[in-house]
């Protein structure tokens, strides 16, 4: 990582089914975690943005403080006891504002956030919203990365959307078919690393 704004921090993987896109996203998330980043992994499905926020808060709970959900608003003693609570968050902040708060707390802990999105779909409004908001995170020099993977037709469809022109400057990698020899070598190494022989 060269720092906030590094073009490699926005990466799109494409390839046919079975070329290892999901496995590579998982590997990259594990690698980021081993370097002190918080990694969240989602699929492009409805509810994806909330899932990103919830995973960010959960996976960084050792680094950031969650705001209280309720506050005491009144106590009544006459006619027995009565206690009233109300939501501490009356203003209902947007997804972007809640993510900026989390990113700010992560920055204070000297940690970054990697968001991985698998099975990119051009027909999901939340994909467009994520890409649009992510460019603001980059412009604000947040320590954040976005790695996405999908079939070429879906990725190309997403890139045609006028609202995500930022993604057209992403780092692209097209994954090809893995040869039988490479598969054999990887399996052999995995088995031998596990203390077994072939």
Model-derived features: where do they sit?
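Walker A/P-loop nucleotide-binding motif
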Residues: 5-27
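Conserved catalytic segments around the Walker B and adjacent sensor/switch elements
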Residues: 11-14, 29-48
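Conserved nucleotide-binding/hydrolysis micro-motifs of P-loop NTPases
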Residues: 18, 45-49, 122, 151-156, ...
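Conserved NTP-binding/hydrolysis module of P-loop NTPases
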Residues: 33-39, 49-85
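Conserved Walker B catalytic segment
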Residues: 88-163
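A short helix-turn-beta junction within AAA+ P-loop NTPase domains corresponding to the substrate/partner-engaging
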Residues: 160-176
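Conserved small helical "lid"/interfacial subdomain of P-loop NTPases
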Residues: 175-198
């Amino acid at each position: 990582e060269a720092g906030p704004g590094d073009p490699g921090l926005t990466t799109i993987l494409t390839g046919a089914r079975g070329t290892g896109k999901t496995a590579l996203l998982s590997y990259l998330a594990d690698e980021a975690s081993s370097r002190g980043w918080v990694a969240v992994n989602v699929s492009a499905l409805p509810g994806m943005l909330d899932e990103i926020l919830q995973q960010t808060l959960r996976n960084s709970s050792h680094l950031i403080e969650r705001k209280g959900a309720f506050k005491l608003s009144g106590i009544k003693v006459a006619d027995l006891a009565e206690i009233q609570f109300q939501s501490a968050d009356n203003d209902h902040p947007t997804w972007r504002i809640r993510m900026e708060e989390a990113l700010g707390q992560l920055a204070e802990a000297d940690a970054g956030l990697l968001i991985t999105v698998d099975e990119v779909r051009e027909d999901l409004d939340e994909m467009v919203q994520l890409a649009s908001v992510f460019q603001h995170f980059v412009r604000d020099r947040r320590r954040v990365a976005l790695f996405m993977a999908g079939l070429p037709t879906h990725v190309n469809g997403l890139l045609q959307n006028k609202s995500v022109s930022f993604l057209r400057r992403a780092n692209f990698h097209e994954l090809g078919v893995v040869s039988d020899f490479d598969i054999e070598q990887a399996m052999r190494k995995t088995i031998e690393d596990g203390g077994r022989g072939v």
